[in-house]
Regions:
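Carboxylate-rich helix-loop segments that flank metal/cofactor sites and access channels
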Residues: 59-92
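Hydrophobic stripe of amphipathic alpha-helices that form coiled-coil interfaces
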Residues: 34-37, 41, 57, 64, ...
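Preference for long, well-ordered alpha-helical segments
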Residues: 107-147
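Alpha-helical transition-metal enzyme core signature, strongest for iron centers
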Residues: 16-27, 43-58, 98-105, 125-139
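Alpha-helical bundle segments that constitute or directly flank the non-heme di-iron/ferroxidase center
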Residues: 3-34, 92-115
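Membrane-interacting alpha-helical segments
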Residues: 1-13, 81-92, 142-147
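Short, structured helix-loop boundary elements
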Residues: 10, 40, 92, 122-125
Length: 147
């Protein structure tokens, strides 16, 4: 477990955008490497959703839609090396790592929503958190079909 401390909301947004980009790259890579149609479709959908999340977060950051107040936010991250791995792994292990990543993303967006005062942005962040939870649930369902 690694602790990351953020000093401003913009720091959190930049980190979230970077994580979304890693997820996009990873899910796209997984979609291209699997021969299972259902799993490929799931990976492609996850990548598409993460592209949308990145665009939303980038817009919030670039348009200064969120007040960049000073914060002291600590996020406990369990490193998900699967995003950075180029080697092929067991599909179940890959899915389990993706599940952990989605759980962490959900928590991060909920934590950020809790310290945000703007109600519109708060709803956006909670929606993204909800979608990350739905990703986790989809991955769990896919994992169960492979057991």
């Amino acid at each position: 477990m690694r602790k990351i401390t953020f000093n401003t909301i913009y720091d959190v947004l930049r980190f979230a955008i970077s994580e979304e980009q890693s997820a996009i790259r990873y899910y796209t890579q997984q979609a291209q490497s699997t021969t299972n149609y259902e799993t490929r479709t799931l990976w492609e959908q996850l990548a598409t959703d993460e592209i949308r999340h990145k665009a939303i977060l980038s817009n919030v950051l670039e348009q200064h839609l969120l007040h960049n107040k000073d914060i002291n936010m600590v996020i406990n991250i369990d490193p998900v090396d699967v995003y950075n791995s180029e080697e092929e792994s067991d599909l179940n292990a890959v899915i389990c790592e993706a599940i952990r990543a989605e759980e962490q993303a959900c928590k991060m967006y909920n934590d950020l929503a809790n310290i945000t005062e703007d109600e519109t942005i708060k709803r956006v962040l909670r929606t993204i958190a909800s979608e990350e939870k739905a990703h986790r649930d989809s991955l769990i369902n896919d994992l169960n079909t492979h057991k």
